[in-house]
């Protein structure tokens, strides 16, 4: 038994790591902080990467955050749901954390994981086109706000 969060997808990843290690493929292990975490309740809670507090401990005053209220998201309005997306980044640097709460927010963790693990800059994500209406747009809009180009920010 490996200590840490007992998540099926974490165990699956660790199993692949062991198999590749045995095969001599020299795999690298994903840091636990970069493994997506989702609590399937109502509303759902999803997170990957550093919290704002963890980022401030590492990067100090260089940390930038944005909270995007899902009230500004068309699909969330259609679904009559609410919640927030929070992105944590380093000024002039990558996004280091994604956090969200709201109905179906666990479905957004994939893009959040890509942003964090690929060290995407807010401007990189802001330049991507997100389908409308989709809750996924909220990640793009949060990145736009973090990049200094807010579109529909409702705080």
Task: Annotate each PLM feature.
Residues 1-33, 93, 134:
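Rossmann-like dinucleotide/flavin-binding elements
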């Amino acid at each position: 038994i490996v200590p840490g969060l007992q998540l099926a997808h974490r165990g699956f990843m660790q199993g692949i790591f062991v198999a590749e290690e045995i095969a001599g493929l020299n795999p690298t292990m994903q840091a636990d902080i970069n493994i997506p975490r989702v609590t399937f309740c109502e509303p759902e809670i999803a997170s990957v990467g550093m919290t704002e507090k963890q980022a401030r401990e590492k990067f100090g005053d260089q940390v930038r955050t944005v909270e995007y209220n899902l009230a500004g998201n068309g699909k969330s309005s259609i679904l009559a749901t609410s919640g927030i997306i929070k992105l944590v980044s380093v000024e002039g640097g990558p996004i280091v954390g994604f956090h969200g709460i709201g109905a179906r927010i666990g479905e957004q963790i994939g893009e959040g994981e890509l942003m964090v693990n690929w060290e995407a800059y807010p401007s990189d994500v802001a330049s991507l086109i997100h389908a409308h209406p989709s809750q996924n747009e909220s990640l793009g809009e949060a990145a736009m706000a973090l990049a200094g180009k807010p579109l529909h920010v409702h705080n």
